[in-house]
Amino acid sequence: MTVRVRIAPSPTGNLHIGTARTAVFNWLFARHHGGKFILRIEDTDLERSRPEYTDNILEGLRWLGLNWDEGPFFQSQRLDLYKEAVQKLLDQGLAYRCYTTSEELEALREAQKARGEAPRYDNRHRNLTPEQRAAYEAEGRSYVIRFKIEDGREIVWNDLVRGKMSWRGSDLGGDMVIARASEEGSGQPLYNFVVVVDDIDMQITHVIRGEDHIANTAKQILLYEAMGAKIPEFSHTPLILNMEGRKLSKRDGVTSISEFQKMGFTAEGLVNYMTLLGWSPPDSTQEIFTLETAAKEFGFERVNKAGAKFDWDKLDWLNSQYIHNTPVDKLTDLLIPFWEAAGYKFDGGRDRAWLEQLVTLISQSLTRLVDAVPQSQLFFSDTVEFSEEGSTQLKQEGSTAVLEAIVTALENQPQLSEAAAQDIIKQVVKEQKVKKGLVMRSLRAALTGDVHGPDLIQSWLLLNQIGLDKSRLSRAITEAN
């Protein structure tokens, strides 16, 4: 048997972190078993589905590296298949037209609520006579198509995450609506139904999705049986929770993959983190995984039942590990869009070689890619603002003389090298009879505006290459005086 799994997002919003995590688990399971990962777009909600959301979903999956083997298939292009399946259930007497109005349903719910009962449809139109149906249609009533669910039926399956699961038919809310009214007569098929038709048609062997679909699974098993199809294996993964233990939602801030991307998370870091959101590797000390490495180890026996808390600190740490170990040329490519978005210009000598030197300088201090914007601002600005500490340092006794001596020494150094920079510092220490610390602090304050920052010599070399070191030294002397 070839393992066949699917991810089936609805294009009613951008790709959500929960959907993406489900996609990761499906992808890992498929690759672990040498199977197929199928992409299906569930766009039957015509009012809320948008092409820009579809584009966002596809782009997000590609960015994460979750390449699919088949698809994308669009449910909106498969309506004839669903309507044919609805008609078969009608012809077999397994489904029927229900003419109960919304007002009648509301009255039923209120009566059940008053009696302390759980709301459910009472199946009142299951056995209408032809005359009763004709009378309702003469009234102009619209209808839905309901699938018959027997109250006494017990639905049992072995969930690969949760073990034996059991539901009674009486707990499923009465006969299930599988289609709304339509002019063709067979109805507009709804989610719980079309999912089963698609999974049968696409020969899905394993359905991997969030635990919020457990009740749907009980209903869908009955539909598989009614359509004479083999029932797939089910795995219901834990929900993603916030740190307070509630389901992660938009109220918690960022939830879409494109937002994580804009915040400066790498695809590799985010995928690594999502892999660990609910799954524990055999080696509990291993935390860094590529998709390919995780696929070799992945299995549902190590997927947790309890909800997985979204830990921003852990995500930041993982992301920083990928940034710190990304080759300079690739990391430069990743950072350029963030610099461009900040309005930084690659002119005045800021060529590719210079950019890669800058990346080498700041890379180990980055947690997110976007951190490169503030950390490199001083290299893209003609001038810098002096912090309170920087200004204080420049006014310290001896600082002005030190800076003037550095300016004089630079007159004989049209292009500064690391060795030459070190020699200038030694020369100034000797000539001015001061400690090296004063020279270094004064030079840093002059060049960067602060007393803290990245490696001073490398910063100086970068500024020298674009002709900004001398002008900043002169301005700092003015500031000191």
Curated annotation (Swiss-Prot):
Q: Write down the InterPro entries for this protein, in alphabetical order.
A: aa-tRNA-synth_I_cd-bd, aa-tRNA-synth_I_codon-bd_sub2, aa-tRNA-synth_I_CS, aa_tRNA-synth_I_cd-bd_sf, Glu-tRNA-ligase_bac/mito, Glu-tRNA-synth_I_codon-bd_sub1, Glu/Gln-tRNA-synth, Glu/Gln-tRNA-synth_Ib_cat-dom
Which family is this protein grouped under?
Answer: Belongs to the class-I aminoacyl-tRNA synthetase family. Glutamate--tRNA ligase type 1 subfamily.
Name of the protein this chain belongs to? Glutamate--tRNA ligase
UniProt subunit comment: Monomer.
Under the GO molecular function aspect, what terms does this record hold?
ATP binding; glutamate-tRNA ligase activity; tRNA binding; zinc ion binding
Give start-end ranges for motif 'KMSKS' region: 247-251
Originating species: Nostoc punctiforme (strain ATCC 29133 / PCC 73102)
Motif 'HIGH' region in this chain: 9-19
Q: Respond yes or no to whether keyword DNA damage is given for this record.
A: no
Mind listing the UniProt keywords for this protein, alphabetically?
Answer: Aminoacyl-tRNA synthetase, ATP-binding, Cytoplasm, Ligase, Nucleotide-binding, Protein biosynthesis
User: Where's it mainly located?
Assistant: cytoplasm
Q: Name one GO cellular component term.
A: cytosol
Q: What class of enzyme is it?
A: ligase
Q: Which Pfam families match?
A: Anticodon_2 (PF19269), tRNA-synt_1c (PF00749)
What chemistry does it catalyse, as a reaction equation?
A: tRNA(Glu) + L-glutamate + ATP = L-glutamyl-tRNA(Glu) + AMP + diphosphate
Q: Where in the cell is it found?
A: Cytoplasm
Question: Per the UniProt record, which EC number(s) apply here?
Answer: 6.1.1.17
Residues binding ATP are K250
